[in-house]
């Protein structure tokens, strides 16, 4: 969120006070293009997709819309923008964002140090005050106009190559399927904040509080390998293919194991196919979306399908073709950014030396479970929605020229695809 509330924000602030500069026109054009995609980050309830490190800043999520409103003359567009701002601030005011002294806390929807960064301090959350820059609007028009509900975005699908994601909208919620975003630095829990399969307004992601046990790792919408008593979280995967219909990545936790994952973005159901090529034995956990653990929670593992229900959330995952088993993880307290207590459905499969594949079906929604599109997995690829996707080549890297050539070719392909 530092992209909208910093880079675009200050560019528009410059454009507001230096309109004679030619660069100001460029800044406004860039923000207009950005706004088309950024609008999809917000649910009908007002909350935005929890993604990245810049989450303790609360309703700074709408700071971009506050400054952008200065440049909008169209009544309908301005009404939509005002609605986004109002709903987001109201949603935040309904969360536990104040401490016992009345100050904004460090955390997302409640005080939570597990998700914080080393640079956070008591005043960090007050970046949210940047959102009140709409008070600088030169006319009273913004304040007099009625705020509108969001336009009907149901079943919207948009691929955004700049953030390696496909965003979809369903039943009033936003879903961002992610493949390729990395943050290889000293910040905490980067694999949780950037590298999960899915981020959604349906439920915020979880962060790890300990490397002992899946209840402490809390890897919603991600993978875990277990070898003996050691756990390895999916991180630093490589993009093999990215578009609005399929996302393919390869994760190599070490040289003896390769897991190529095919994700077909869809809601409320989506498929994850994991092609495993291994020289050792291990367990593979695949987790669905977290669900608030409250008094209305119902857990079910009937027919080897793990589903969690409460009043306004449904999350489930199961394995096709009877591979492995499905269960539900009761997570340790305070791992989730939105709820102090959550549960996560998951599948677990044992793999021996060799090449294997597993097909998992995930559900995320707020209403009754709907029928899912059929998928076929063959020895040479996947057939889904009348399109055949051949399996990608797996290779184990070494110091040979062939291995180095493949690595260079893959990087070039990724760069070319990005600029296309």
Predicted regions and their residues:
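Contiguous hydrophobic segments
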Residues: 17-35, 78-88, 133-155, 187-217, ...
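Non-catalytic C-terminal accessory modules of carbohydrate-active enzymes
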Residues: 123-293
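Extended repeat-based interaction scaffolds and adjacent low-complexity, acidic/S/T/P-biased segments
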Residues: 215-419
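Extracellular polysaccharide-recognition and catalytic grooves
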Residues: 1-149
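Context-gated lysine
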Residues: 16, 22, 29, 36, ...
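A sequence-composition feature that detects small, non-aromatic residues
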Residues: 15, 48, 60-63, 121, ...
């Amino acid at each position: 969120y530092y992209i909208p509330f910093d880079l675009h924000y200050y560019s528009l602030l410059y454009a507001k006070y230096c309109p004679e500069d030619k660069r100001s026109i460029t800044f406004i054009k860039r923000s207009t293009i950005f706004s088309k995609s950024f609008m999809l980050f917000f649910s009908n309830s007002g909350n935005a997709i929890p993604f990245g490190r810049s989450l303790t800043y609360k309703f700074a999520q709408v700071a971009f819309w506050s400054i952008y409103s200065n440049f909008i003359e169209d009544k309908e567009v301005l009404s939509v923008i005002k609605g986004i701002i109002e709903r987001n601030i109201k949603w935040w005011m309904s969360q536990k964002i104040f401490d016992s002294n009345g100050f904004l806390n460090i955390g997302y929807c409640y005080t939570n140090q597990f998700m914080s960064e080393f640079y956070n301090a008591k005043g960090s959350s007050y970046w949210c005050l940047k959102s009140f820059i709409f008070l600088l609007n030169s006319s009273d028009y913004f304040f007099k106009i009625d705020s509108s509900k969001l336009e009907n975005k149901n079943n919207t699908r948009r691929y955004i190559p700049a953030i390696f994601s496909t965003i979809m909208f369903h039943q009033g919620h936003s879903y961002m399927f992610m493949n390729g975003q990395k943050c290889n630095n000293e910040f905490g829990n980067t694999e949780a904040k950037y590298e999960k399969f899915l981020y959604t307004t349906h439920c915020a992601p979880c962060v790890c509080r300990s490397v002992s046990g899946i209840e402490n790792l809390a890897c919603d919408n991600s993978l875990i390998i277990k070898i003996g008593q050691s756990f390895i979280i999916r991180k630093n995967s490589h993009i093999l293919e990215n578009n609005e219909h399929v996302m393919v990545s390869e994760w190599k936790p070490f040289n003896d194991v390769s897991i190529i994952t095919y994700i077909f973005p869809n809601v409320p159901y989506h498929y994850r196919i994991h092609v495993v090529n291994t020289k050792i034995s291990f367990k593979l956990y695949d987790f669905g979306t977290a669900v608030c653990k409250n008094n209305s929670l119902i857990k079910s593992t009937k027919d080897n399908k793990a589903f969690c229900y409460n009043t306004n959330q449904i999350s489930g995952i199961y394995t096709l073709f009877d591979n492995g088993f499905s269960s539900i993880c009761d997570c340790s307290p305070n791992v989730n950014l939105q709820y102090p207590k959550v549960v996560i459905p998951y599948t677990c499969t044992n793999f021996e030396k060799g090449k294997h594949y597993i097909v998992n079906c995930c559900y995320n929604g707020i209403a009754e479970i709907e029928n899912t599109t059929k998928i076929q997995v063959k020895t040479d690829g996947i057939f889904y929605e009348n399109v055949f996707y051949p399996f990608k080549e797996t290779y184990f890297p070494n110091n040979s020229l062939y291995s180095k050539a493949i690595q260079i070719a893959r990087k070039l392909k990724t760069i070319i695809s990005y600029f296309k």
